[in-house]
């Protein structure tokens, strides 16, 4: 049985996964292209994706934010070495909002996976992990069938 190390990561080093099916579909619809970057570099990217997540399910986000405010982050996320969030978009969004509202530094608790989208060989592995995490947690938002299809297609076909 292997234990995973969970780290408390300052939010400024993290960014939403532009390779995520739902997010990449939204980026293409709204902006055409959008350069993924951390808040430390420029908060514009994370702010635009956060707005999409807020609009996508305001009730779920409000519930997550209230829970984190009262009890702290109960479920850790998963991030890649470069700060790309593979699991935990809603928690990250809630923490960013709390950081702004409260005015104190917040930290995203996550396992750091030893992969990067820069390495083509890692992409399929990352997608398998992302989907396994997504399917293994009941409270996740369901993927729209089109977003899921685009996600799978982009991973399998465009990485050839």
Predicted stretch roles:
Residues 49-53, 100-160:
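Amphipathic, charge-rich alpha-helical segments that serve as recognition/docking helices
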Residues 1-106:
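Short, charged/polar connector segments at secondary-structure boundaries
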């Amino acid at each position: 049985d292997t234990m995973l190390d969970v780290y408390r990561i300052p939010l400024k080093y993290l960014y939403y996964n532009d390779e995520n099916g739902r997010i990449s579909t939204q980026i293409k619809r709204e902006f055409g292209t959008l350069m993924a970057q951390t808040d430390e570099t420029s908060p514009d990217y994370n702010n635009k994706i956060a707005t999409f997540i807020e609009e996508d399910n305001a009730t779920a986000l409000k519930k997550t934010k209230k829970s984190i405010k009262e009890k702290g982050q109960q479920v850790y996320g998963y991030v890649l070495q470069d700060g790309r969030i593979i699991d935990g978009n809603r928690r990250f969004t809630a923490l960013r909002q709390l950081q702004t509202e409260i005015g104190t530094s917040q930290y995203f608790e996550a396992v750091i996976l030893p992969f990067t989208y820069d390495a083509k060989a890692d992409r399929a592995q990352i997608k398998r992990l992302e989907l396994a995490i997504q399917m293994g947690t009941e409270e996740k938002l369901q993927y729209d069938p089109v977003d899921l299809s685009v996600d799978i297609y982009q991973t399998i076909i465009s990485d050839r």
